[in-house]
Amino acid sequence: MAEYYALQRQLLQVTLICTVVIFGAVWWAYSLNTAASYLLGAMGGLLYLRMLGKAVERIGERRRQFGKSRLALFVVLIVLAARWQYLELMPVFLGFLTYKAALIWYTLRAVIPTAENS
């Protein structure tokens, strides 16, 4: 289980690093408003990844709740972005997907042989 917790921590750290780097790039290239929209989505993605990790920890328990709260988080983020005039929908959506970068990083690290893994 320690290996799982280490993986979970790594994924959260990589997601946070990607969030900071992309936030700075978006702020530099576009505007603070667009960057704030991205940041809101990225924070939602971090929360989603954390909730997903907690759900994986509970695999095998008798409860059968299929991620309704995780879906609700995504829906609330998108509705908030659509309704609030200061937020932009696309940066919020792309920010939410930032956690996928950490998953791709982990997959590539596991698939591509390195000197450590050989």
From Swiss-Prot:
Belongs to the bacterial AtpI family. Its main location: membrane. A possible function for this protein is to guide the assembly of the membrane sector of the ATPase enzyme complex. The gene is atpI. Keywords: Cell membrane, CF(0), Hydrogen ion transport, Ion transport, Membrane, Transmembrane, Transmembrane helix, Transport. This is ATP synthase protein I. It is found in: Cell membrane. GO terms for biological process: proton transmembrane transport. It is a multi-pass membrane protein. The chain crosses the membrane at residues 11-31, 73-93, 94-114. Pfam families: CGL160_C. PANTHER family: NF-KAPPA-B INHIBITOR-LIKE PROTEIN-RELATED, PROTEIN CONSERVED ONLY IN THE GREEN LINEAGE 160, CHLOROPLASTIC. InterPro entries: CGL160/ATPI_dom (IPR056309). It comes from the Bacteria. One of its GO terms (cellular component) is plasma membrane.
